[in-house]
Amino acid sequence: MNPALSQHYREILVGLGEDPQREGLLDTPKRAAKAMQYLCHGYGQTLEEIVNGALFASDNDEMVIVRDIELYSLCEHHLLPFIGKAHVAYIPTGKVLGLSKVARIVDMFARRLQIQENLTRQIAEAVRQVTSAAGVAVVIEAQHMCMMMRGVEKQNSQMFTSVMLGAFRDSNTTRQEFLQLIGRSK
């Protein structure tokens, strides 16, 4: 745990008018610092470590989809959570990625201070980089606490972002197949 980070949380409590020496807050700066480090541990990870060689030769050239990957991240503007799910697809060209690695790639980028638009693109580009896929598609749907708990306070709004690369961008048929399979096409 980073002692400087803990001290900053103590200063935040004082700045809010709280007494960091009161019983309920004695360990709060340390706990908050530890929680923030956990929530942002994606900074300490690399794509190479995450994939860890889990690329496998395959003749499959049909769409691979991992949908409903739960995620949470922290909005870089307010440090408040956004929570949702990612749907990731790619079209292999000779190799497939270990199934859990797709979710780990999502988590690596989500565990950073982030905006959803950038998160979506980072995931898509990472999957393309690792797999050399003919196409990659990522859709993220999430609820943002910065919009629910402050500002306009809209409790039921969701944000959808998508990035389509390669075949998913070039072929409406491929894109529509993906959207239909994740339940986002009529």
Swiss-Prot record:
It is an enzyme of class 3 (hydrolase). It comes from the Bacteria. Its EC number is 3.5.4.16. Pathway: Cofactor biosynthesis; 7,8-dihydroneopterin triphosphate biosynthesis; 7,8-dihydroneopterin triphosphate from GTP: step 1/1. Keywords: GTP-binding, Hydrolase, Nucleotide-binding, One-carbon metabolism. Gene3D superfamilies: 1.10.286.10, 3.30.1130.10. InterPro entries: GTP-CH-I_C/QueF, GTP-CH-I_N, GTP_CycHdrlase_I, GTP_CycHdrlase_I_CS, GTP_CycHdrlase_I_dom. It holds the Pfam family GTP_cyclohydroI. GO terms for cellular component: cytoplasm. GO terms for molecular function: GTP binding; GTP cyclohydrolase I activity; zinc ion binding. GO terms for biological process: one-carbon metabolic process; tetrahydrobiopterin biosynthetic process; tetrahydrofolate biosynthetic process. It catalyses: GTP + H2O = 7,8-dihydroneopterin 3'-triphosphate + formate + H(+). Belongs to the GTP cyclohydrolase I family. Homomer. This is GTP cyclohydrolase 1 1.
